[in-house]
Amino acid sequence: MRIIKYLTILVISVVILTSCQSSSSQESTKSGEFRIVPTTVALTMTLDKLDLPIVGKPTSYKTLPNRYKDVPEIGQPMEPNVEAVKKLKPTHVLSVSTIKDEMQPFYKQLNMKGYFYDFDSLKGMQKSITQLGDQFNRKAQAKELNDHLNSVKQKIENKAVKQKKHPKVLILMGVPGSYLVATDKSYIGDLVKIAGGENVIKVKDRQYISSNTENLLNINPDIILRLPHGMPEEVKKMFQKEFKQNDIWKHFKAVKNNHVYDLEEVPFGITANVDADKAMTQLYDLFYKDKK
């Protein structure tokens, strides 16, 4: 009997000890043993909204959350420094699916699995927010953020659908020295559609196409949006010069009616970001400012 009693106590003790160790291990993971390195600004801003610490951040001229001010920089989003990242001993290095192919050599040098998230549209970003919440124990924060974005989107769509006429919109995405035309497949194109605008470009298989001003004149948009990507002040000056020196622009209805607008990188940008609520609201107000 004594032997049986002793074995029973021993088994119970082992079970309790194992349970405690398991609980401790799970709690350790929950309490932030993740060492996360986002390689893009959009991901960095999203992690901030999810109340997640990071050990590395992308190098950018944009203002990042103050909570990350002392976090080491790891280089540009498409060219992160492998050695700088390795020094941080990350558990997760995050990127976006748009540049997945370009980032594969980087992950190979790191000898790490790549984590890619869809930030090509509002819907894609919201799905990614849910994934990040599940992955890093921030489900409640992810739900709260998505609920807010859904609420703003629904309000904008409900107001837009009541408008009798929807403006035809041309979207130009500029980089220093040149510009492209954005389609519905781009993030900014997605926002324009949500806000009640009709993109004059009907291409379905690409996010951006090259510009042909003569063809654009034939579809004569009501509104022209100009969005900078990188070096915004330089791009803004480039657009101003183009519209002043290229005579064809003066024949556009949008130019004649002074309906050409320069968008700011914040809250817009070429990839989805957590400022989408502000971007949707600004576009709606722009499209229907005379019909409130």
UniProtKB/Swiss-Prot annotation:
<feature type="binding site">
    <location>
        <position position="61"/>
    </location>
    <ligand>
        <name>heme</name>
    </ligand>
</feature>
<protein>
    <recommendedName>
        <fullName>High-affinity heme uptake system protein IsdE</fullName>
    </recommendedName>
</protein>
<keyword id="KW-0564">Palmitate</keyword>
<dbReference type="Pfam" id="PF01497">
    <property type="entry name" value="Peripla_BP_2"/>
</dbReference>
<dbReference type="GO" id="GO:0015886">
    <property type="term" value="P:heme transport"/>
</dbReference>
<comment type="similarity">
    <text>Belongs to the bacterial solute-binding protein 8 family.</text>
</comment>
<dbReference type="InterPro" id="IPR019957">
    <property type="entry name" value="ABC_transptr_haem-bd_IsdE"/>
</dbReference>
<feature type="binding site">
    <location>
        <position position="42"/>
    </location>
    <ligand>
        <name>heme</name>
    </ligand>
</feature>
<feature type="binding site">
    <location>
        <position position="60"/>
    </location>
    <ligand>
        <name>heme</name>
    </ligand>
</feature>
<keyword id="KW-0349">Heme</keyword>
<keyword id="KW-1003">Cell membrane</keyword>
<keyword id="KW-0813">Transport</keyword>
<dbReference type="GO" id="GO:0020037">
    <property type="term" value="F:heme binding"/>
</dbReference>
<dbReference type="InterPro" id="IPR002491">
    <property type="entry name" value="ABC_transptr_periplasmic_BD"/>
</dbReference>
<feature type="binding site" description="axial binding residue">
    <location>
        <position position="229"/>
    </location>
    <ligand>
        <name>heme</name>
    </ligand>
</feature>
<dbReference type="GO" id="GO:0071281">
    <property type="term" value="P:cellular response to iron ion"/>
</dbReference>
<keyword id="KW-0479">Metal-binding</keyword>
<feature type="lipid moiety-binding region" description="N-palmitoyl cysteine">
    <location>
        <position position="20"/>
    </location>
</feature>
<dbReference type="InterPro" id="IPR050902">
    <property type="entry name" value="ABC_Transporter_SBP"/>
</dbReference>
<dbReference type="GO" id="GO:0046872">
    <property type="term" value="F:metal ion binding"/>
</dbReference>
<dbReference type="GO" id="GO:0005886">
    <property type="term" value="C:plasma membrane"/>
</dbReference>
<keyword id="KW-0732">Signal</keyword>
<keyword id="KW-0408">Iron</keyword>
<keyword id="KW-0472">Membrane</keyword>
<comment type="function">
    <text>Involved in heme (porphyrin) scavenging. Binds Fe(2+) and Fe(3+) heme but the largest fraction is Fe(2+) heme. Functions as a high-affinity heme binding protein and probably has a role in relaying heme-iron from cell wall-anchored isd proteins receptors to the probable permease IsdF.</text>
</comment>
<feature type="binding site">
    <location>
        <position position="41"/>
    </location>
    <ligand>
        <name>heme</name>
    </ligand>
</feature>
<feature type="signal peptide">
    <location>
        <begin position="1"/>
        <end position="19"/>
    </location>
</feature>
<feature type="lipid moiety-binding region" description="S-diacylglycerol cysteine">
    <location>
        <position position="20"/>
    </location>
</feature>
<feature type="binding site" description="axial binding residue">
    <location>
        <position position="78"/>
    </location>
    <ligand>
        <name>heme</name>
    </ligand>
</feature>
<feature type="domain" description="Fe/B12 periplasmic-binding">
    <location>
        <begin position="35"/>
        <end position="291"/>
    </location>
</feature>
<keyword id="KW-0449">Lipoprotein</keyword>
